[in-house]
């Protein structure tokens, strides 16, 4: 069994966790949402400073919660890509320092691989191959998971990620940041069929549409025009109905592409990861469609949908058990394809 302490600081969560054999021993998350709410979104420099202020306490809390000594830790890991460079550097530097101080193996982990591994925290016996639907504020992708470190992108958004679309529509409706949870809550009492909105198909040069790629910029623009028209007419904004219609449109678009992709590639399991995996509309639509097509769909526990270090530790432990180690000179990258994961290891 492999026990790994991991650090996640790719954006606005300072997270530290210890995982043993895909079982979470401790998980600490210091959210920066209150800090960034006044700006309506994440400010990179503010995020980096907040990470610096909380990282040491988070590490100490994770060790205390796990009730483990450093002699029981087999490896130290940190998210190294993709993400905000300054934020990533805080976590990576802390992990390297701990690895050197305690003479432990060091591993850098791809943030999106972590979201794939979040499913293993509740489904430890899951075996590849399977389809991963990654839906977050920065990424929306369909990934063919072949084995640890081997991934193939089958579809993605051509512009705004799903989570980014939620935040932008929430800002348009003056709902605050982050937008996803607020829209989800309002949608519960709204009419999802009140407004017809575009699902964002991507045209192919030879005609027809890409079966797995999508676009959310047109949907965002459609909501903007809807709001402008209602305001011109002097009508009160039916926020609940707009939220429900928008959320249902996103859920349908993601569900159609995920189901089609799984069936076309003969994959019987769809594992969903990322912050939007917590969305109730997506969960309901995808579960119903999967059941109708004799497919299995897996969602992480809600606490592991958003950024956390447990998923990073889980991925790192799998790499460590295979003898994959990162050089202590490893740097951070703001962008890195999942297909390049193995470049992080020697």
Swiss-Prot record:
<dbReference type="InterPro" id="IPR017861">
    <property type="entry name" value="KAE1/TsaD"/>
</dbReference>
<comment type="function">
    <text>Required for the formation of a threonylcarbamoyl group on adenosine at position 37 (t(6)A37) in tRNAs that read codons beginning with adenine. Is involved in the transfer of the threonylcarbamoyl moiety of threonylcarbamoyl-AMP (TC-AMP) to the N6 group of A37, together with TsaE and TsaB. TsaD likely plays a direct catalytic role in this reaction.</text>
</comment>
<dbReference type="GO" id="GO:0061711">
    <property type="term" value="F:N(6)-L-threonylcarbamoyladenine synthase activity"/>
</dbReference>
<dbReference type="InterPro" id="IPR017860">
    <property type="entry name" value="Peptidase_M22_CS"/>
</dbReference>
<feature type="binding site">
    <location>
        <position position="307"/>
    </location>
    <ligand>
        <name>Fe cation</name>
    </ligand>
</feature>
<dbReference type="Pfam" id="PF00814">
    <property type="entry name" value="TsaD"/>
</dbReference>
<keyword id="KW-0808">Transferase</keyword>
<feature type="binding site">
    <location>
        <position position="111"/>
    </location>
    <ligand>
        <name>Fe cation</name>
    </ligand>
</feature>
<feature type="binding site">
    <location>
        <position position="167"/>
    </location>
    <ligand>
        <name>substrate</name>
    </ligand>
</feature>
<feature type="binding site">
    <location>
        <position position="180"/>
    </location>
    <ligand>
        <name>substrate</name>
    </ligand>
</feature>
<feature type="binding site">
    <location>
        <position position="279"/>
    </location>
    <ligand>
        <name>substrate</name>
    </ligand>
</feature>
<feature type="binding site">
    <location>
        <begin position="134"/>
        <end position="138"/>
    </location>
    <ligand>
        <name>substrate</name>
    </ligand>
</feature>
<protein>
    <recommendedName>
        <fullName>tRNA N6-adenosine threonylcarbamoyltransferase</fullName>
        <ecNumber>2.3.1.234</ecNumber>
    </recommendedName>
</protein>
<keyword id="KW-0479">Metal-binding</keyword>
<dbReference type="GO" id="GO:0005506">
    <property type="term" value="F:iron ion binding"/>
</dbReference>
<feature type="binding site">
    <location>
        <position position="115"/>
    </location>
    <ligand>
        <name>Fe cation</name>
    </ligand>
</feature>
<keyword id="KW-0963">Cytoplasm</keyword>
<keyword id="KW-0408">Iron</keyword>
<dbReference type="InterPro" id="IPR022450">
    <property type="entry name" value="TsaD"/>
</dbReference>
<dbReference type="InterPro" id="IPR043129">
    <property type="entry name" value="ATPase_NBD"/>
</dbReference>
<feature type="binding site">
    <location>
        <position position="184"/>
    </location>
    <ligand>
        <name>substrate</name>
    </ligand>
</feature>
<comment type="similarity">
    <text>Belongs to the KAE1 / TsaD family.</text>
</comment>
<keyword id="KW-0012">Acyltransferase</keyword>
<dbReference type="GO" id="GO:0002949">
    <property type="term" value="P:tRNA threonylcarbamoyladenosine modification"/>
</dbReference>
<dbReference type="GO" id="GO:0005737">
    <property type="term" value="C:cytoplasm"/>
</dbReference>
<keyword id="KW-0819">tRNA processing</keyword>
<dbReference type="InterPro" id="IPR000905">
    <property type="entry name" value="Gcp-like_dom"/>
</dbReference>
């Amino acid at each position: 069994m492999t026990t790994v302490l991991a650090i996640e600081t790719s954006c606005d969560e300072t997270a530290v966790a210890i995982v043993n054999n895909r079982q979470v021993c401790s998980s600490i998350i210091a959210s920066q949402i209150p800090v960034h709410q006044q700006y309506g979104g994440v400010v990179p420099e503010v995020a980096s400073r907040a990470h610096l202020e909380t990282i040491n306490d988070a590490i100490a809390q994770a060790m205390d919660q796990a009730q483990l000594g450093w002699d029981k830790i087999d490896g130290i890991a940190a998210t190294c890509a993709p993400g905000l460079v300054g934020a990533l550097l805080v976590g990576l530097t802390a992990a390297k320092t701990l690895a050197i101080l305690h003479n432990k193996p060091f591993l850098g982990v791809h943030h999106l691989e972590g979201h794939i591994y979040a499913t293993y925290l509740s489904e430890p016996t899951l075996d590849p191959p399977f389809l991963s639907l990654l839906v977050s504020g920065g990424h929306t992708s369909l990934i063919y998971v072949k084995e640890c470190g081997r991934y193939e992108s089958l579809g993605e958004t051509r512009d705004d990620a799903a989570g980014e679309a939620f935040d932008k529509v929430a800002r348009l409706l003056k709902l605050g940041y982050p937008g996803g949870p607020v829209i989800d809550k309002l949608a519960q009492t709204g009419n999802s069929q009140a407004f017809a909105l575009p699902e964002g198909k991507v045209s192919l040069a030879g005609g027809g549409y890409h079966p797995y790629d999508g676009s959310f910029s047109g949907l965002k623009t459609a909501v903007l025009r809807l709001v402008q028209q209602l305001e011109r007419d002097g009508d009160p904004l039916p926020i609940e109905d707009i939220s429900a219609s928008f959320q249902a449109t996103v859920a349908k678009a993601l569900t159609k592409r995920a189901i089609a992709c799984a069936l076309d590639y003969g994959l019987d399991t769809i594992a969903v990861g990322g912050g939007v995996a917590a969305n109730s509309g997506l969960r309901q639509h995808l579960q119903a469609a999967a059941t109708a097509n004799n497919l299995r769909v897996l969602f992480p526990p809600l606490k592991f949908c958003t950024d956390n270090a447990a998923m990073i530790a889980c991925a790192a432990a799998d790499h460590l058990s295979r003898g994959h180690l990162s050089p202590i000179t490893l740097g951070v990258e703001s962008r890195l394809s999942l297909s390049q994961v193995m470049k992080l290891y020697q």
